[in-house]
């Protein structure tokens, strides 16, 4: 028994390098715990050359149990009730290792009764019942109905969508053009109304505009006679040319401001109001009278001076300047305008 125990301990402690517990001896040698403790103590006494650590468990009177690794320092030795070697450890730190062991044959208490395991009742297997396989009914195959493919419909839809998109774009463009034309027409109407109001308020200006228009028309007729030479024009062409020229002259006159139009009036019309003003001034100087007041002050009475002519309102200037910006005449109109102005100044110089 001692040889078996020592062989088992050496094998596990030095070859496998695992700790040996006293419970390992109980399971391996099938002995009781007191016998296992005795064998552990005998092995500790006999083997003095080998190096290993001994783990001891001490039971004290105050019902405390301590695991001691250092045998040289055992505390409270007088109060120890029981002490035994718990394990041999080949390493410094104690890590218990437990093997899986079948403990059916290692019972500490034995009796005359034997354990019997009842045999498991056999499971009666159910016989397989054969199911009748239903034969599929064979029916005559009917010809499938042919239907048109959906791809054509999809293609036509995509084409329709494309046509709709172009139509929508065209409609939107037309609406925008209509709005723009209506806006331009409204602006033209407003300009014409403003010009008519200005002409009604200032009849002198309207007369001046007519005179200027007649002068430009006469100059244009003279230039046409010089350029035309021996080529007589038909009455229809002359009428149409006169209308176009009149329209061009009116557009040019509309582009000029009120001050510019007044600058183009002949000198005779400008000298007349200046003479009248000079004639009025001495009268106004002769009219004031003076008399001596009760307090001895000289009091002079003068008539109220005539109000100076009003300048054209800024609204009119803005309307005329906006008409200048919006109406951009072509190169032909500019040439005509330059020609008429040159002829006008030549006549004026003569």
From Swiss-Prot:
The modification Phosphothreonine is found at residue 223. Residues 320-332 have a biased composition (Polar residues). Residues 249-262 have a biased composition (Acidic residues). Residues 146-162, 172-195, 234-248, 274-286 have a biased composition (Basic and acidic residues). Residues 131-350 are annotated as: Disordered. GO terms for biological process: base-excision repair; DNA amplification; DNA metabolic process; DNA replication, removal of RNA primer; double-strand break repair via break-induced replication; error-prone translesion synthesis; lagging strand elongation; leading strand elongation. One of its GO terms (cellular component) is delta DNA polymerase complex. Its main location: nucleus. The modification Phosphoserine is found at residue 230. The keyword Phosphoprotein applies. The keyword Phosphoprotein applies. Keywords: DNA replication, DNA-directed DNA polymerase, Nucleotidyltransferase, Nucleus, Phosphoprotein, Transferase. Coiled coil: none annotated. One of its GO terms (molecular function) is DNA-directed DNA polymerase activity. DNA polymerase delta (DNA polymerase III) participates in chromosomal DNA replication. It is required during synthesis of the leading and lagging DNA strands at the replication fork and binds at/or near replication origins and moves along DNA with the replication fork. It has 3'-5' proofreading exonuclease activity that correct errors arising during DNA replication. It is also involved in DNA synthesis during DNA repair. DNA polymerase delta is a heterotrimer of POL3, POL32 and HYS2. POL32 can form homodimers. This is DNA polymerase delta subunit 3.
């Amino acid at each position: 028994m001692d040889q078996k125990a020592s062989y088992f301990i050496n094998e596990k402690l030095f070859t496998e390098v695992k700790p040996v517990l006293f419970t390992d001896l109980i399971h391996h040698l099938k002995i009781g715990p007191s016998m296992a403790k005795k064998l552990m103590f005998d092995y500790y006494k006999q083997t003095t050359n080998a190096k290993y650590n001994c783990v001891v468990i001490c039971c004290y009177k105050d019902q405390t149990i301590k695991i001691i690794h250092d045998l040289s320092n055992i505390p409270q030795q007088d109060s120890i009730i029981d002490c035994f070697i718990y394990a041999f450890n080949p390493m410094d730190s104690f890590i218990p290792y437990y093997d899986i062991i079948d403990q059916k044959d290692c019972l500490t208490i034995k009796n005359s009764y034997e354990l019997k395991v009842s045999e498991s009742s056999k499971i009666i297997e159910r016989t397989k019942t054969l199911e009748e396989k239903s034969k599929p009914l064979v029916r005559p195959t009917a010809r499938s109905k042919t239907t048109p493919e959906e791809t054509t419909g999809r293609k036509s839809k995509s084409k329709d969508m494309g046509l709709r998109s172009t139509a929508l774009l065209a409609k939107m463009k037309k609406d925008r053009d209509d709005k723009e034309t209506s806006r331009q027409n409204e602006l033209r109407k407003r300009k014409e109304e403003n010009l008519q109001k200005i002409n009604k308020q200032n009849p002198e200006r309207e007369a001046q505009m007519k005179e200027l228009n007649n002068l430009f028309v006469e100059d244009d007729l003279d230039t046409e006679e010089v350029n035309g030479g021996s080529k007589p024009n038909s009455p229809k062409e002359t009428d149409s040319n006169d209308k176009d020229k009149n329209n061009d002259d009116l557009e040019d006159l509309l582009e000029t401001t009120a001050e510019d139009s007044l600058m183009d009036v002949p000198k005779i019309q400008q000298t007349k109001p200046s003479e009248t003003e000079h004639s009025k001034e001495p009268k106004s100087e002769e009219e004031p009278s003076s008399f001596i007041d009760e307090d001895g002050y000289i009091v002079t009475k003068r008539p109220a001076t005539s109000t100076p002519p009003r300048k054209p309102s800024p609204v009119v200037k803005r309307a005329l300047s906006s008409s200048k910006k919006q109406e951009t005449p072509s190169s032909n109109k500019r040439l005509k305008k330059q020609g008429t102005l040159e002829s006008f100044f030549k006549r004026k110089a003569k």
